[in-house]
Amino acid sequence: EISACLVGSEMCIRDSSMVSTSEKYASSSLTDEKSLELFRTLERIMREEKIYKDNFITKDKVAEILGTNRTYLSRIINEQSKLSFTHYVNRFRIEEAIRLLSDPNNETPLKAISTELGFNSISTFYNLFQSSVGMTPSQYRNKVMELQKEQ
């Protein structure tokens, strides 16, 4: 059976009955070095440019920023962080929420923090925060205030 495939950015035609599964993946896989380089670039962009704050962030947008495609992006994130794209993005959002809520002088309403961090709903923010931290954002903020008063 003849089929079309994509290798790099060039289109090719192959007889798929003659191509082993490992050869298919080998021809489309990134080298470990290239994969690590792209992941480091992604980490830098996430931390410095805070693209996770975009509530319409997609694999396609991030892949375009990195000059790769969504398949490679997913593979890189999974291989390097052991997370899906969505979980990876949300990890940055929750880390930023923790940072903001750890500041006892920050009185920004939770709804505003949720929106600022790219969450489409406050309930999603609450649920993810609680599953990651073990308490709701309100509980976390109150705990920070209590600890601040004790000092």
List each model region and its residues.
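Membrane-proximal linker segments that couple transmembrane helices to downstream signaling/catalytic modules
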Residues: 14-115, 128-131, 138-151
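ABC-family nucleotide-binding domains
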Residues: 118
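The DNA-contacting recognition helix of HTH DNA-binding domains
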Residues: 70, 121-123
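Single conserved hydrophobic/aromatic residue that forms the stacking wall/gate
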Residues: 1-15
